[in-house]
């Protein structure tokens, strides 16, 4: 996924407010909900005829129906986003907010692709591996990919650990091709 520098500025600014108010998780849930609302009615929220105030009012109403309230900083944040026509960056802002939040907690974001739902023991071993190299606790973004057959693929801070059967088969194929070229 490509991240926008503009989205990064919005994400960091909102995270700074969230940290100051000690509401990082609440603000992340707010961004999740706003993204869901926006993505479910993108045509409506991208309509240039509809004023930003009306768009925010609609979001507030929908949030209220989910039992959620918007504080003044969240409302000001959305006002900036919609007035500057940056609503298409909301998902990017949300993802960067989460990434920056992990970093602010002195943890390391790590992608974990695995062929099945990971067991606690597997996660523990993978955490130890990441901790050994990153010197920080990982926060895994787990994706299940049955094409890996078995094993896990962990990526963090430029490191890549591939213990998957699929990865091993690819290495064997590359080595066989190299040997074939050499003979």
Swiss-Prot record:
Chief location category: membrane
Lineage: superkingdom: Bacteria
Gene3D superfamilies: N-terminal domain of the delta subunit of the F1F0-ATP synthase (1.10.520.20)
Membrane disposition: Peripheral membrane protein
Keywords attached to this entry: ATP synthesis, Cell inner membrane, Cell membrane, CF(1), Hydrogen ion transport, Ion transport, Membrane, Transport
GO biological processes: proton motive force-driven ATP synthesis
Subunit and interaction comment: F-type ATPases have 2 components, F(1) - the catalytic core - and F(0) - the membrane proton channel. F(1) has five subunits: alpha(3), beta(3), gamma(1), delta(1), epsilon(1). F(0) has three main subunits: a(1), b(2) and c(10-14). The alpha and beta chains form an alternating ring which encloses part of the gamma chain. F(1) is attached to F(0) by a central stalk formed by the gamma and epsilon chains, while a peripheral stalk is formed by the delta and b chains.
NCBIfam families: ATP_synt_delta, PRK13441.1
Identification of the protein by name: ATP synthase subunit delta
The species this protein was found in: Thermotoga maritima (strain ATCC 43589 / DSM 3109 / JCM 10099 / NBRC 100826 / MSB8)
């Amino acid at each position: 996924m490509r991240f926008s520098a503009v989205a990064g500025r919005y994400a960091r600014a909102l995270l700074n407010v969230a940290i100051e108010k000690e509401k990082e998780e609440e603000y992340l849930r707010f961004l999740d909900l706003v993204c869901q609302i926006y993505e479910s009615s993108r045509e409506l929220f991208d309509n240039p005829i509809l004023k930003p105030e009306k768009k925010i009012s609609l979001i507030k109403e929908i949030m209220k129906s989910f039992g959620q309230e918007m504080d003044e900083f969240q409302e000001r944040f959305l006002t900036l986003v919609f007035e500057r026509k940056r609503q298409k960056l909301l998902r990017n802002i949300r993802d960067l907010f989460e990434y920056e939040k992990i970093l602010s907690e002195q943890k390391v974001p790590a992608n974990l692709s695995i062929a099945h739902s990971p067991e606690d023991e597997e996660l523990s071993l993978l955490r130890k591996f990441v901790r050994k190299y990153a010197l920080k606790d990982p926060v895994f973004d787990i994706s299940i990919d049955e094409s890996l057959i078995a094993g896990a693929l962990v990526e963090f801070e430029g490191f890549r650990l591939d213990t998957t059967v699929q990865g091993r088969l690819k290495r064997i194929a590359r080595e066989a091709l190299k040997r074939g070229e050499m003979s």
